Amino acid sequence: YIDHHDIDPTVVTALQKLKVKVIHDINECTTVQVYNAYKSKLNDHAPFVATCAAITDYMEDRPLGSKLLQIYDRQFALISATVMTYNIVGHQREPDYLQYLVEELSDSKFPHDIPNTFEFAQIQVEKLSQIIAKVKKGMKTMSNLGHMEILDSGASGAVNFVMGLSGKDVGVAYKERVDHGIYAVSVRGSKNCKVHLGRIVNFLATSLGGSGGGHDKACGAVVPKPKI
């Protein structure tokens, strides 16, 4: 079991009692930990994939992540990670395409070698730019956070704008999943946020009959519609 999210120590102990090997470090990206554990079995393209993952997880400044980033030109790695992120997010309900991306990366291809990735990233960027105006118009603020219901895009794509444009230390974006009777909730915290949002969201979501959690400044939840 390899993870970098906040886990209750009793869960780790229970896994170890079951003879599960646990690799768990909240200070490094999960993919970086996978690479570090199995690098002797991986090809020389693997550190590039791990570097992109660290950037996407805002963890390229950590000890292992920063060492990997030094291998590559920083701007090359940043644009590659960004393009891959937009392609993954834009196809998140298309497992065949996601599998195709995995296979292309496994064949040691860079994002610019994979057909149409930059064009698709441009489409995603255009969609995000449209969200900015909608957030400015539709978000609401409380004393310590900004929040907004998202109607026509993903909550995770809008939540950083909600936090930033509200001027608050926490942003919350939520979108109804009509087919499932739930709300998907994304939460982000600024660098000034002093509380561990992942733990708070885990407690709140589970107490409301949902589930959730994550990092101190980036997390998410699923909440039953009547409890939103």
For the regions a language model picked out, list residue spans one by one:
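Accessory alpha-helical/coil subdomains and C-terminal extensions
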Residues: R62-V135
